[in-house]
Curated annotation (Swiss-Prot):
Bias type Polar residues, positions: 1-19, 325-348
Subunit structure: Forms homodimers, and probably higher-order oligomers too.
Topology class, membrane: Multi-pass membrane protein
Domain topic, free-text comment: IncA proteins share the same general organization: a short N-terminal domain, a large bilobed hydrophobic domain, and a C-terminal cytoplasmic domain.
Keyword set, alphabetical order: Coiled coil, Host membrane, Membrane, Secreted, Transmembrane, Transmembrane helix
Family assignment from sequence similarity: Belongs to the IncA family.
Protein name as annotated: Inclusion membrane protein A
Species this chain originates from: Chlamydia caviae (strain ATCC VR-813 / DSM 19441 / 03DC25 / GPIC) (Chlamydophila caviae)
Position of the signal peptide: none
Gene (name only): incA
Coiled coil ranges: 243-298
Subcellular location: Secreted; Host vacuole, Host pathogen-containing vacuole, Host pathogen-containing vacuole membrane
Location of region: Disordered: 1-25, 320-355
Length: 355
C-alpha cells in the first residue's frame, strides 16, 4: 500500500537581470523551479485499512459434496454399529464376507468422520488471521516510519518558509533603499550580496532563484550611470513581481503543510484502528484455539468409543465361534443315539430266525 507520492509544485520565477553592457536591454529568464514535496495519499491507506479478513473458502458445489459425504459416512457408521449391536443381542451368526464388509465400512466411515472433524476445525482461519496480524504489524511499523518522515518534511518546509519570509523582507528593504539611493551604491551592493550568500543555505532550488539577483549585483558593480539606475529600478519592479510569486509559494507551502498535518492525523487514526483490529484478532485467535482444544478432546473420546466397539466385535466373534462348536457337538451326540437302537433291532431279528 503506497503511503506517499512525490508532488512537484512548479513556481515560475521571472527575474530580470539587466546587463548594462548591452545598453539597458533587459535579460528576462522564465524558469520553472520545481519544489519536491513528499505528500501522502490517504486513499490507498484507507482502502488497506478497510480490507476485510476473509478466510479462504471452497466452491459451494464442493462444499455441498463434502458435506453430503460426511453425512453419509456418519450414517453408515451409525447403521453398522446398530447392526452389530442387534446381531449381538439376537445371537445371530454373521458370515465372514459380511463381517469383513462391515469392518471395511466402519473403518472408511470412521476415517471420513475424523477427516470431517479435522476439516471442521478453524485452523486455516487461525493461520490466515495470524498472517493478517503479522501484516498489520508490518503496516503499523511502516506507517509510523511514514509519519516520522512527514513530520521531518513538515519541519524542513517550515524552516524554508521562515527563511523565504526573511528573504522577502530583505529584498523589500533593498528595493526601498535602491529607490531612495542616488549616490554611491558600493555599500548597498555589498549588503545585498551578503544577504544573498546567507540565503544560499536554504537549498539548491532557492539558490537557483537567487542567481538572477547575483547577476544584478555584479552588473551594479560594473556601472553606476543614470541609465543603469533606471534599468535597475525596472529590474526592481520585476523583482517585486518575483516577490509576489514567492508570497504565492509561501501560501502554497502553508497549504501543503496543512495537508501534511491532516495526513499525519489520518495516519495516526489508521494506526489506532490497526491496533484495535490487532487486539480483536488476538481475541479471536484465543477463542479459536480454545475451540480447537475442545474438538481435540472430542476426537479423543470418539477414538476411545471406537476402541470399545472393536472390543465388542471381538467378543461377538468369540461368542459366535463358541455357539457353532456347541451346535456341532450336539448334532454328533444325536447321531450316535439314533445309531444304537438300530443295532439292537438287528441283533433281535437274527436271534428270532435262529430259533
Amino acid at each position: 500500500m503506497t503511503v506517499s507520492t512525490d508532488n512537484t509544485s512548479p513556481v515560475i520565477s521571472r527575474a530580470s537581470s539587466p546587463t548594462f553592457g548591452d545598453h539597458g536591454k533587459d535579460f528576462d529568464n522564465n524558469k520553472i523551479i520545481p519544489i519536491s514535496i513528499e505528500a501522502p495519499t490517504s486513499s490507498a491507506a484507507a482502502v488497506g485499512a478497510k480490507t476485510a479478513i476473509e478466510p479462504e473458502g471452497r466452491s459451494p458445489l464442493l462444499q455441498r459434496i463434502c458435506y453430503l459425504v460426511k453425512i453419509i459416512a456418519a450414517i453408515a457408521l451409525f447403521v453398522v454399529g446398530i447392526a452389530a449391536l442387534v446381531c449381538l443381542y439376537l445371537g445371530s451368526v454373521i458370515s465372514t464376507p459380511s463381517l469383513i464388509l462391515m469392518l471395511a465400512i466402519m473403518l472408511v466411515s470412521f476415517v471420513i468422520v475424523i477427516t470431517a472433524i479435522r476439516d471442521g476445525t478453524p485452523s486455516q482461519v487461525v493461520r490466515h488471521m495470524k498472517q493478517q496480524i503479522q501484516q498489520f504489524g508490518e503496516e503499523n511499523t511502516r506507517l509510523h516510519t511514514a509519519v516520522e518522515n512527514l513530520k521531518a518534511v513538515n519541519v524542513e518546509l517550515s524552516e524554508q518558509i521562515n527563511q523565504l519570509k526573511q528573504l522577502h523582507t530583505r529584498l523589500s528593504d533593498f528595493g526601498d533603499r535602491l529607490e531612495a539611493n542616488t549616490g554611491d551604491f558600493t555599500a548597498l551592493i555589498a549588503d545585498f550580496q551578503l544577504s544573498l550568500e546567507e540565503f544560499k543555505s536554504v537549498g539548491t532550488k532557492v539558490e537557483t532563484m537567487l542567481s538572477p539577483f547575483e547577476k544584478l549585483a555584479q552588473s551594479l558593480k560594473e556601472t553606476f550611470s543614470q541609465e543603469a539606475v533606471q534599468a535597475m529600478m525596472s529590474s526592481v519592479t520585476e523583482l517585486r513581481t518575483n516577490l509576489n510569486a514567492l508570497k504565492e509559494l509561501i501560501t502554497e507551502n502553508k497549504t501543503v503543510i496543512e495537508q501534511l498535518k491532516a495526513d499525519a492525523q489520518l495516519r495516526e487514526e489508521q494506526v489506532r484502528f490497526l491496533e484495535k483490529r490487532k487486539q480483536e484478532l488476538e481475541e479471536a485467535c484465543s477463542t479459536l484455539s480454545h475451540s480447537i482444544a475442545t474438538l481435540q478432546e472430542s476426537t479423543t473420546l470418539l477414538k476411545d468409543s471406537t476402541t470399545n466397539l472393536h472390543a465388542v466385535e471381538s467378543r461377538l466373534i468369540g461368542v459366535m465361534v463358541q455357539d457353532g462348536a456347541e451346535s456341532s457337538t450336539v448334532e454328533e451326540a444325536s447321531q450316535d443315539d439314533s445309531a444304537q437302537p438300530q443295532d439292537e433291532n438287528q441283533s433281535d431279528a437274527g436271534e428270532h430266525k435262529d430259533s
